[in-house]
């Protein structure tokens, strides 16, 4: 009986160690709004194959581990705020030993503030788009937002509308 339990224990350890050897991209992010840090929000991971995973975050600062070699749409969902999105392509070279983390900042907009604007439909339509598309830059060994100019344009339009 002891031998069977020992073999079962070793088998479980091998399964756990195999699962922890998967490579991940570490996303460090902070979620704020006009009043400070946002707590108790949901992060929805939508994978290119249709798989959806949901994580509840208690604090504004959160770390998310995403598997490599996937295209993922992240949605930050919080009650009384407009949902924000960002697309991430986690493809990295197979021989890369250390995968650098990516730091992300989300500034959520309260739905009450948007509803007070005369052009609220245009603002909501702007906010439907992902704020960026993050990919790994092989030359610089870092992560880049390949839509940074688009992101800057959206942010300028939003600031202009909320003045």
Provide a role label for each language-model segment.
Residues 1-28:
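Bacterial Sec-dependent N-terminal signal peptides
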Residues 23-35, 60-62:
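A short, amphipathic beta-strand motif
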Residues 25, 34-48, 131:
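Short, ordered, surface-exposed loop/turn motifs in non-cytosolic proteins
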Residues 49-61:
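Short, acidic Ser/Thr/Gly-rich low-complexity loop/linker segments typical of extracellular
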Residues 63-73, 79:
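Short Pro-Gly-centered beta-turn/loop motif in secreted/extracellular proteins
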Residues 90-130, 136, 145, 152:
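Extracellular beta-sheet/turn segments enriched in Thr/Pro/Gly and aliphatic residues
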């Amino acid at each position: 009986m002891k031998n069977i339990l020992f073999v079962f224990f070793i088998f479980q350890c091998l399964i756990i160690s195999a699962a922890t050897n998967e490579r991940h991209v570490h996303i460090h992010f902070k979620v704020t709004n006009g009043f400070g840090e946002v707590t108790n929000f949901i992060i929805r991971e939508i994978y290119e194959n249709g798989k959806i995973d949901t994580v509840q975050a208690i604090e504004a600062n959160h770390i998310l581990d995403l598997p490599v070699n996937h295209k993922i749409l992240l949605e930050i969902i919080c009650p009384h705020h407009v949902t924000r999105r960002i697309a991430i392509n986690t493809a990295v070279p197979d021989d890369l030993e250390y995968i650098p983390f990516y730091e992300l900042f989300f500034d959520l907009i309260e739905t009450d503030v948007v509803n007070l604007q005369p052009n609220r439909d245009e603002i909501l339509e702007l906010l439907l788009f992902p704020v960026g598309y993050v990919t790994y830059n092989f030359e610089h060994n870092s992560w880049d937002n390949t839509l940074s100019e688009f992101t800057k344009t959206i942010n300028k339009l939003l600031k202009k509308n909320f003045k």
